[in-house]
Amino acid sequence: MAREFSLEKTRNIGIMAHVDAGKTTTTERILYYTGKIHKIGETHEGASQMDWMEQEQERGITITSAATTAQWNNHRVNIIDTPGHVDFTIEVQRSLRVLDGAVTVLDSQSGVEPQTETVWRQATEYGVPRIVFANKMDKIGADFLYSVSTLHERLQANAHPIQLPIGSEDEFRGIIDLIKMKAEIYTNDLGTDILEEDIPAEYLEQAEEYREKLVEAVAETDEELMMKYLEGEEITNDELKAAIRKATINVEFFPVLCGSAFKNKGVQLMLDAVIDYLPSPLDIPAIKGVNPDTDAEEERHASDEEPFAALAFKIMTDPFVGRLTFFRVYSGVLNSGSYVLNTSKGKRERIGRILQMHANSRQEIETVYAGDIAAAVGLKDTTTGDSLTDEKAKIILESIHVPEPVIQLMVEPKSKADQDKMGIALSKLAEEDPTFRVETNVETGETVISGMGELHLDVLVDRMRREFKVEANVGAPQVSYRETFRASTQARGFFKRQSGGKGQFGDVWIEFTPNEEGKGFEFENAIVGGVVPREFIPAVEKGLVESMANGVLAGYPIVDVKAKLYDGSYHDVDSSETAFKVAASLALKEAAKSAQPTILEPMMLVTITAPEDNLGDVMGHVTARRGRVDGMEARGNTQIVRAYVPLAEMFGYATVLRSATQGRGTFMMVFDHYEDVPKSVQDEIIKKNGGNA
């Protein structure tokens, strides 16, 4: 079957925003106007097409990034709707990794909000070009130019309007196109009847001012255009559009549009902008990877002629077809029924069926091409971030960074029947979500689940009940602490056992030094002259890794430490891998005496929004919770406080804030970094855990 849409006519986009900015409604309207659905589903009625999980429809928020494909102006647009809630950050990260462009949706009353900053930062890390859609122009307090100013102030983004609204709140009735210098007036409720006319006289001066600002800003990114502009020559609409496209794709410029998805205004123009300004797979740099056989860096271009290479970015369990693996094809062609190599795991996988997804309905297709996003049935060993490639042209693509979980809960099944089902349910949920971890406490036999926040674990426990019919008791949330060393030290680990039969002998000298935050554990072999034989070196590293899983102070994992094995000795007969593993763990215990071990706790970036009258209360809350204020901002009669607060102090804060502000205060928090706990708190944690120190 030949390719339906050329690569030039393909767009892979994500829709990203702060929770409640109207992102899912915007996606719904896109599906409506592109002919994918015939009736519009409203999020607040729990009928949205993209939010297809029961919990999503009940809570009115998007949890998983549903993928769908639509058509507009003879182009194929693959859309991923991502969650705006911080607990589901991995969903945003994995979609950004496989997208070519994104639409950032703002609530035009609030402008840039905390989660907008988080997803914007992530999109910048991945180099994703963006256009901005200032939504909810019909809402009381909507202010388009204020929203644009927040893009400059909070994100330092080179963002400029390519449209202006005609009216706002109840009076919002159309849009001025600053490129064509025409007005688009909406004459019916469904937004399908649009009149193009001259700009109303009362808006003309403002339109000319912003057109001038737009031309100047775009000219700064394009030398040729700059010369024309400075010489006072006429810049044609086509030249302006081409320059905006180029600057947007280079992530140097962000076009800002406006509208109201709920009132069906501005969505078609936003779709036009997706086609006009966001990149096709051909416009983005070739994907880089490593050949697992040669360790050489290789790249794959967006071409059907190159060998097949794809990245699995999401696993989902579908009630009808079972395990679905969502993947983005970077190069080559894949047919259903064929075999691929999972180079990340070194496993051969058979592609049973290939499905094109539309939220939770599906259409079976025979072939996928470079630039496509699809789902496959039949992959057994593939997980998020794995590379799938042609067996004869291996490449491992850069994987997806998975943040460490910061909160944990104990779960126990209510009955023996639930016990067996719970194991299956938890492993399936962990397959789908890499930030969700399941561990069994060896000493107590308890099952501990960890995740990115209370809502995250709440939703997963809820899914366990609904989808897998498992009833479970859930404990109170606990913080995932870590341990580290703050001083450098050298330590010997000596293990010798002679008691009849074969003896054991292992002897190592290891230098431990603190590592940079977030770097994890790094091992260096500095043995010279074979004082520790090469075959035992991996055993030393393994012994350290295993011992570090259970820290020296309170049993929390040790992180961010470098270990350099520099000396030791061995016995011709009695030395073994086991002996060197034990010796390494003894060296770690010895080092702990002088390496200033300390406990680390997760620090959250908390953004509290409260009425001005309650500012004193909020500042008191932060101080009482061992927090430190990072910044404040007044917005009308509301104050926004940003602070770093330990996660351990934030449990139950929603209730405290609600009662202090009569229900008018809200807060959001996102994990930021780990920090040393104060000595008094450390002593408490050690005591509570029957400390190892």
Curated annotation (Swiss-Prot):
Gene3D superfamilies documented for this protein: 3.30.230.10, 3.30.70.240, Elongation Factor G (Translational Gtpase), domain 3 (3.30.70.870), P-loop containing nucleotide triphosphate hydrolases (3.40.50.300), Translation factors (2.40.30.10)
GO biological process: ribosome disassembly
Highest rank taxon of the organism: Bacteria
Domain tr-type G span(s) in chain numbering: 8-282
Subcellular location: Cytoplasm
Gene Ontology molecular function: any one: GTPase activity
Protein's UniProt keywords contain Protein biosynthesis: yes
Keywords assigned: Cytoplasm, Elongation factor, GTP-binding, Nucleotide-binding, Protein biosynthesis
Binding site for GTP: 17-24, 81-85, 135-138
Protein function: Catalyzes the GTP-dependent ribosomal translocation step during translation elongation. During this step, the ribosome changes from the pre-translocational (PRE) to the post-translocational (POST) state as the newly formed A-site-bound peptidyl-tRNA and P-site-bound deacylated tRNA move to the P and E sites, respectively. Catalyzes the coordinated movement of the two tRNA molecules, the mRNA and conformational changes in the ribosome.
PANTHER family named among the record's database cross-references: RIBOSOME-RELEASING FACTOR 2, MITOCHONDRIAL (PTHR43261:SF1), TRANSLATION ELONGATION FACTOR G-RELATED (PTHR43261)
Protein name per UniProt: Elongation factor G
Organism: Streptococcus suis (strain 05ZYH33)
Gene name as annotated: fusA
